[in-house]
A protein has these predicted regions:
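Short, histidine-centered active-site or binding-site loop motifs used for metal coordination
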Residues: 7-11, 41-43, 249, 253, ...
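Alpha-helix capping and helix-loop boundary segments enriched in small/acidic/polar residues
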Residues: 14-17, 48, 260-263, 309, ...
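Short, acidic loop-beta-alpha module within alpha/beta folds
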Residues: 20-24, 320, 488
Length: 530
């Protein structure tokens, strides 16, 4: 059977890198296996899942090249199917209606973890179990489960409600060991909602513990005792389906074979396995991805820096850079490659090589990778993209195409993101902006001041047609020696004098690009800061 995977986000506006990484992993695995990749929009939150939010999601996926193979499914369009499934579960005894806590007096529908849980894949008997409960709290047993209290460290009651299925062969005992209640004796009536028991004076539960285990393709075997689970709402009292119902029914409808999602869904999976079984459907394979964290090991968020795909797009990251980086954030191809083409990623990808530990976001590493990809762009493509960014700048109107191409030729290998182009203004304006503190620091020594004045005088004598990097370098070396300045020590003050910045391309190439006509007035202007 061909693999079928889905990306099922709840679009609420900006697309977090954690969500889009899940999409990337689903897409890569589907393409690696020659399977099907689907987009399912879980748009049941009508206030937040606006048309604009959905449009943003689809634009982000298109920008990253995450194409899907069938028309997208909108969860709201499946409501009738969801409610029909809930009705079948109720009819089969796998769910029940309950009015307690219902809004406006309506009935909610809860999924019941099955009393005959061993029929469900992954459920096993762990053995006899005994737990102490809070002696001063009554035990209530009804169709919704078992309500009791556990004692806190200070001895105070901590109320809990757990599913009936978690307490096979339950007996409730008092302090003398007398059996006050046996669940097996009344289980049929309790499940049918015809019996409710209230037991006072209980101090201990004895029961047969059962567990549910599933194999996670990333985390390995994961196990949970049934007595830690509760029945859960699948249809609210207002008639709207809950996430659990819609998610599982849609997976059945779309014949999903592999569910790849964040590890915040690990706990949901135990519940969903029971639902697949109750619906008579095969249980998909699961892979839960590690969380993306900051340097402190906490969930990566906007407080830590750029966290949304749109942030990186507007700051001039290439789409493949982000795809490449996020694919390797929590996954390894099995070697030391950090730059991989789309085809290489598809060929190498496997869920078995996804790491189970949290993945740390490193903006500097991502930025450096983007710089490498920018450096490899064909020059004409770089000029085209860079021009689009340049014309949006205050200095970008009326750029000379030939002059701009020359600047691109020098700056391409030094560009980390296309947002860096905002700092190219000094190439195209008469005078750059000068920072007084920077000038004061760079121009404070008298030999530097003298050298800058002498450079202006010497540059003035050079014919424009030989105002080249080689000629400029020779002049600078000569004046550096004449002023008793150590070789290289003049370059930074000179850069500030002619560009207003402390970073950029080689100073000789920069001055050649500026030309004699822009360089001389800048040296003269810089002298005002001496």
């Amino acid at each position: 059977m061909s693999v079928r995977l889905r990306f099922a986000p709840s679009p609420t506006g900006n697309v977090h890198i954690g969500n889009i990484r899940a999409a990337i992993f689903n897409w890569l695995y589907a393409r690696h296996c020659g399977g099907t990749f689907l987009l399912r929009v879980e748009d049941t939150d009508l206030e937040r899942s606006t048309p604009e939010a959905i449009r943003t999601l689809k634009e982000v996926m298109a920008w990253l090249g995450l194409n899907y193979d069938e028309p997208e499914m909108y969860q709201t369009s499946q409501k009738d199917r969801h409610l029909a499934a809930a009705g079948k579960l109720v009819a089969a005894g796998a769910a029940y209606r309950h009015a307690k806590g219902g809004e406006g007096g309506g009935e909610a529908i809860l999924f019941r973890l099955p009393w005959d849980a061993e029929q469900c894949p992954g459920v096993a008997v762990a053995g006899p179990c005994e737990i102490e409960i809070h002696a001063g709290t009554e035990v209530v047993v009804d169709k919704t489960g078992i309500n009791f209290a556990m004692p806190s460290a200070k001895g105070t009651p901590m109320p809990v409600q757990k599913c009936l299925a978690g307490f096979q062969n339950l007996t409730v005992l008092d302090a003398e060991g007398t059996v006050l209640f046996s669940l097996n004796d009344v289980i049929a009536e309790v499940l049918a909602g015809k019996r409710r028991e209230v037991i006072a004076g209980a101090v201990k539960f004895r029961f047969t513990r059962r567990t549910i285990t599933y194999h996670d393709l990333v985390k390995g075997d994961l196990t949970k005792p049934l007595d830690s689970l509760s029945d859960f709402v699948i249809v609210r009292s207002d008639g709207s389906p809950v996430f659990h119902l819609g998610n599982v029914v849609d997976d059945v409808t779309q014949q999903i074979t592999h569910i790849v999602r964040g590890d915040d869904h690990v706990e949901n999976t135990y519940r969903h396995i029971f639902m697949f079984h109750a619906l008579g459907a095969a249980v998909p394979l699961y892979a839960h991805l590690p969380m993306i964290v900051n340097a402190q090991g906490k969930p990566y968020s906007k407080r830590d820096g750029d966290a949304y795909v749109g942030d990186f797009r507007t700051k001039g990251f290439l789409p493949h850079t982000l795809l490449n980086y996020l694919a390797l954030l929590g996954w390894s191809p099995g070697d030391d490659r950090e730059k991989m083409t789309r085809d290489e990623l598809v060929a190498a990808f496997s869920l078995e090589r996804v790491k189970s530990s949290a993945a740390q976001m490193d903006i500097r590493k991502l930025t450096d990778l983007n710089g490498q990809y920018i450096a490899e762009l064909p020059p004409a493509e770089f000029v085209k993209i860079a021009h689009g960014w340049a014309v949006a700048q205050p200095w970008g109107a009326g750029l000379d195409a030939a002059e701009f191409a020359k600047v691109c030729g020098v700056m391409q290998i030094r560009t980390k993101t296309f947002a860096d182009i905002a700092g190219w203004g000094f190439f195209f304006t008469d005078l750059p902006a000068y920072d007084e503190k920077t000038c004061a620091k760079q121009f404070k020594d008298k030999p530097i001041q003298d050298a800058l004045v002498m450079l202006g005088e010497e540059f003035a004598t050079i014919p424009a047609d030989v105002f080249t990097a080689a000629t400029i370098e020779a002049v600078i070396h000569g004046i550096t020696a004449a002023c008793g300045i150590q070789q290289g020590k003049l370059n930074q003050p000179l850069r500030v004098a002619v560009t207003g910045t402390t970073v950029g391309a080689g100073i000789y190439e920069t001055i050649e690009l500026l030309g004699k006509g822009r360089t001389l007035p800048r040296l003269e202007h810089a002298a005002r800061f001496f």
